[in-house]
């Protein structure tokens, strides 16, 4: 679907300030994204989520991430993620390809 190398660059530029993506990695301002794919919203152990994230009740996958990453506050009103989103579909596809590759168990 997307390009993993391009996705890595997007992660470094737009995500790494607040997120890690490594097994056993620490939470930053945002949760460690390792194991994100297939996990329900608000479920990274040891991270303090808003009720909005905990109660959304969806499982992260390509489709849900495509929608969320376009406009996080619209997808989960009340989230504390301050990122405005990635409007370009191709960039979202690249980022998701990277997340699936680098952050999967």
Swiss-Prot record:
<keyword id="KW-0349">Heme</keyword>
<feature type="disulfide bond">
    <location>
        <begin position="21"/>
        <end position="103"/>
    </location>
</feature>
<keyword id="KW-0496">Mitochondrion</keyword>
<feature type="binding site" description="axial binding residue">
    <location>
        <position position="19"/>
    </location>
    <ligand>
        <name>heme c</name>
    </ligand>
</feature>
<comment type="similarity">
    <text>Belongs to the cytochrome c family.</text>
</comment>
<keyword id="KW-0479">Metal-binding</keyword>
<feature type="binding site" description="covalent">
    <location>
        <position position="15"/>
    </location>
    <ligand>
        <name>heme c</name>
    </ligand>
</feature>
<dbReference type="Pfam" id="PF00034">
    <property type="entry name" value="Cytochrom_C"/>
</dbReference>
<dbReference type="GO" id="GO:0009055">
    <property type="term" value="F:electron transfer activity"/>
</dbReference>
<keyword id="KW-0249">Electron transport</keyword>
<feature type="binding site" description="covalent">
    <location>
        <position position="18"/>
    </location>
    <ligand>
        <name>heme c</name>
    </ligand>
</feature>
<feature type="modified residue" description="N-acetylglycine">
    <location>
        <position position="2"/>
    </location>
</feature>
<dbReference type="GO" id="GO:0046872">
    <property type="term" value="F:metal ion binding"/>
</dbReference>
<keyword id="KW-0679">Respiratory chain</keyword>
<feature type="binding site" description="axial binding residue">
    <location>
        <position position="81"/>
    </location>
    <ligand>
        <name>heme c</name>
    </ligand>
</feature>
<keyword id="KW-0408">Iron</keyword>
<keyword id="KW-0007">Acetylation</keyword>
<keyword id="KW-1015">Disulfide bond</keyword>
<keyword id="KW-0813">Transport</keyword>
<dbReference type="InterPro" id="IPR002327">
    <property type="entry name" value="Cyt_c_1A/1B"/>
</dbReference>
<dbReference type="GO" id="GO:0020037">
    <property type="term" value="F:heme binding"/>
</dbReference>
<dbReference type="InterPro" id="IPR036909">
    <property type="entry name" value="Cyt_c-like_dom_sf"/>
</dbReference>
<dbReference type="InterPro" id="IPR009056">
    <property type="entry name" value="Cyt_c-like_dom"/>
</dbReference>
<dbReference type="GO" id="GO:0005758">
    <property type="term" value="C:mitochondrial intermembrane space"/>
</dbReference>
<comment type="function">
    <text>Electron carrier protein. The oxidized form of the cytochrome c heme group can accept an electron from the heme group of the cytochrome c1 subunit of cytochrome reductase. Cytochrome c then transfers this electron to the cytochrome oxidase complex, the final protein carrier in the mitochondrial electron-transport chain.</text>
</comment>
<protein>
    <recommendedName>
        <fullName>Cytochrome c</fullName>
    </recommendedName>
</protein>
